[in-house]
Swiss-Prot record:
Documented EC number(s): 3.1.26.3
GO process terms (BP): mRNA processing; regulation of gene expression; rRNA processing; tRNA processing
Protein name per UniProt: Ribonuclease 3
Family: Belongs to the ribonuclease III family.
Source taxon at top rank: Bacteria
Cofactor(s) named in the record: Mg(2+)
Domain DRBM: 155-225
InterPro entries: dsRBD_dom, RNase_III, RNase_III_dom, RNase_III_sf
Gene name linked to the record: rnc
Species this protein is from: Serratia proteamaculans (strain 568)
Primary localization: cytoplasm
Residue runs in coiled coils: none
Binding-site residues for Mg(2+), renumbered to this chain: E41, D114, E117
ATP-binding in keyword set: no
Residues at the catalytic site: D45, E117
Length: 226
């Protein structure tokens, strides 16, 4: 991989890997090599959840568990991580197989989100928990400053359902219209039909649940709740 691209990424991350092979593994999708990033992603997911949970616990001493769980879910959900991946310009650094390259995997939200988690796992193995915690908090500084407890942190499907129920409208219906990819790396496309919207709203995700949440979020935007 181009060293200029790698160095630019490390500057954006705010961290330089001592073991460059960990960085390369974190950037490697399973379509490109047998030494891919899924184990690092597993590790990074757990570390991220802990660091964000601890940060919320310290910041909001009077907030109950339900609100903290919803805030954490907002901060660690796939589209937040994918947004962060785009801020790092991860797409230009990913190591993808020919099929994923052809299908635009370098901009797929699920791949960007998974890679951010893999980078967190890689940083932990390259350093220690204190270093990776400081790095995560640096990445999340503005998002942590902006977040607050309340109904806004409920997941999109719940918010959409409550909105419709409050207006005595039928509940939304979700229909799987397409499933792409292999069993280990699928992308679901969902159509969500909502009273008050003339056309179905489309959502995609790496699981049916994530695709439904994405569709519900788009429906909320169209209903001008966001």
């Amino acid at each position: 991989m181009n060293p200029i691209v790698i160095n630019r990424l490390q500057r954006k991350l705010g961290y330089t890997f001592q073991q460059q092979e960990l960085l390369l593994q974190a950037l490697t999708h399973r379509s490109a090599s047998s030494k891919h990033n899924e184990r690092l992603e597993f590790l990074g997911d757990s570390i991220l959840s802990f660091v964000i949970a601890n940060a919320l616990f310290q910041r909001f001493p009077r907030v109950d568990e339900g609100d903290m769980s919803r805030m954490r879910a907002t901060l660690v959900r796939g589209n937040t991580l994918a947004e962060m991946g785009r801020e790092f310009d991860l797409g230009e650094c990913l190591r993808l197989g020919p099929g994923e390259l052809k299908s635009g995997g370098f901009r797929r939200e699920s791949i960007l989100a998974d890679t951010v988690e893999a980078l967190i796992g890689g940083v932990f193995l390259d350093s220690d928990i204190q270093t990776v915690e400081r790095l995560i908090l640096d990445w999340y500084r503005s998002r942590l400053d902006e977040i607050s407890p309340g109904d806004k942190q409920k997941d999109p499907k719940t918010r959409l359902q409550e909105f419709l129920q409050g207006r005595h409208l039928p509940l939304p219906s979700y229909l799987v219209v397409q499933v792409r990819g292999e069993a280990h790396d699928q992308e679901f496309t969902i159509h969500c039909q909502v009273s008050g919207l003339s056309e179905p709203v489309v959502g995609t995700g790496s699981s049916r649940r994530k695709a439904e949440q994405a569709a519900a979020e788009q429906a909320l935007i169209k209903l001008e709740l966001e």
